[in-house]
Regions:
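Residue-level signature of catalytic and energy-coupling elements of molecular machines
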Residues: 17, 68, 181, 253, ...
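Short loop/turn motifs at secondary-structure junctions
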Residues: 102-104, 199, 247, 332
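Acidic, glycine-rich loop-and-beta core segments that form the ion-binding/anion-interacting portion
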Residues: 178-222, 226
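N-terminal amphipathic/basic leader segments beginning at the initiator methionine
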Residues: 2-39
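Glycine-rich phosphate/pyrophosphate-binding loop regions near the starts of catalytic domains
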Residues: 27-190
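Buried hydrophobic packing segments
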Residues: 28, 50, 94-95, 200-203, ...
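Acidic-glycine-rich active-site phosphate/pyrophosphate-binding loop
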Residues: 61-64, 69-71, 174, 213, ...
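Glycine-/charge-enriched secondary-structure boundary and capping motifs
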Residues: 2-13, 121-136, 152-159, 210-211, ...
Length: 349
């Protein structure tokens, strides 16, 4: 028997299937190939992913990084045994942060930890990651799948990612030019996205609630579980199109902490985003969460995106143009507020 096979057999006895790892890599290669762009310099399988930086048109290129995971939304994917969209969420959580600086995402890396490497499941997860990369213009240049027998149940897995983007230093969006009278525009979300799922799981008792899988008239015939698993919206291409023609002064990715935690991150001291609560197009899933869990409205806005996945601040004189551009990109975009002087960085009225 060859030495390598002996090692593999010993490792398999400890719970790590090297052969399954090889199989998973082969299955995911076709998905990774979809993400290749002009910056890719090598194929998957090396010790490091190489990427050529597009700096010719920039005076002072700056790299912008972001890393995130999907959190306990993974549990919904596991309950539905549907794993081909959760990777979109992982990419979205990272690239939507990177674009808030005005940076164009370049490449992405993923990390999967699992109790047991089931090649077909791993390939489904990576297929979702690849789709997110395609949507954001990112190349998937590397990743890691780690099998953790004895630490995780066989069906369990966790997913995280890392995005790197680039922007010319003079074009970094840093809120320094924001002024009273500027307009706050909302970009609609596709649903809960990837935050607040610990509360969602408690409200709906997801481990013991068969009604989650049944069609729900309030949700347009979709089940609660299906609605919850809807992938996080990726706003990269829409924001890049907006940046080409409009003076964008601030961008907020509405994630964990909702409006109260995320909008202030793009507002400078002395200014306040005054949001018209009645203008927000709250999605039915949030109404259902609030009613089922008897959750106060402020808590909802302090936890969830409530139907607004991203907000941008633009001059009032360019608001109409911004809406036209975003609509042309397929976004449901609308005005939800204005910038005023104030000590509180966000007020919902």
């Amino acid at each position: 028997m060859e030495h390598q096979n002996s090692q593999s057999a010993s490792y398999a006895a400890a719970g790590v299937d090297i052969t399954a790892g090889y199989r998973a890599v082969e299955l995911m290669k076709k998905h990774i190939a979809r993400t290749k762009n002009e910056g890719c310099l090598d194929d998957v399988g090396g010790f490091g992913g190489c990427f050529g930086l597009p700096m010719a048109s920039m005076e002072e290129p700056v790299l912008v990084s972001g890393t995130d995971g999907v959190g306990t939304k993974l549990r919904i994917a596991q309950l539905l045994d549907k794993h081909d969209t959760i990777g979109i969420d992982c990419v979205a959580m990272c690239v939507n942060d990177v674009i808030c600086c005005g940076a164009r995402p370049l490449f992405f890396l993923d990390y999967i930890a699992c109790g047991k490497n089931i090649p077909e499941k791993i390939a489904q997860i990576v297929a979702g990651v690849a789709e997110g990369c395609v949507q954001s213009g990112s190349a998937l240049i590397g990743g890691e799948t780690a099998e953790h027998p004895g630490m995780m149940a066989e069906d369990d897995y966790d997913l995280a990612g890392f995005s790197v983007g680039i922007v010319d230093k003079k074009k970094i969006i840093d809120n320094s030019r924001m002024a009273p009278g500027d307009v706050v525009i909302a970009l609609a979300s596709t649903g809960v996205h990837s935050n607040g799922f610990s509360l969602v799981r408690k409200v709906f008792d997801v481990e013991n609630n068969p009604a989650l899988m049944k069609p729900n008239d309030f949700l347009g015939g979709k089940s609660i579980a299906e609605t919850l698993l809807t992938p996080t919206k990726i706003y990269v291409r829409s924001i890049l199109a907006l940046l080409e023609q409009v003076d964008v002064k601030g961008i907020s990715h509405i994630t964990g902490g909702g409006f109260y935690e995320n909008i202030p991150r793009s507002i400078p001291d002395g200014l306040c985003a005054e949001i018209d609560r009645s203008a927000i197009r709250i999605l039915p899933i949030f109404q259902l969460i609030a009613e089922t869990g008897s959750i106060p409205q402020r808590d909802m806005f302090n936890t969830f995106n409530m139907g607004v996945g991203m907000s941008v601040v633009v001059p009032a004189s360019q608001a109409e143009k911004a809406l036209e551009i975003l609509t042309a990109q397929g976004e449901d975009a609308y005005v939800i507020g204005t910038i005023v002087q104030g000590e509180e960085k966000v007020i919902l009225k």
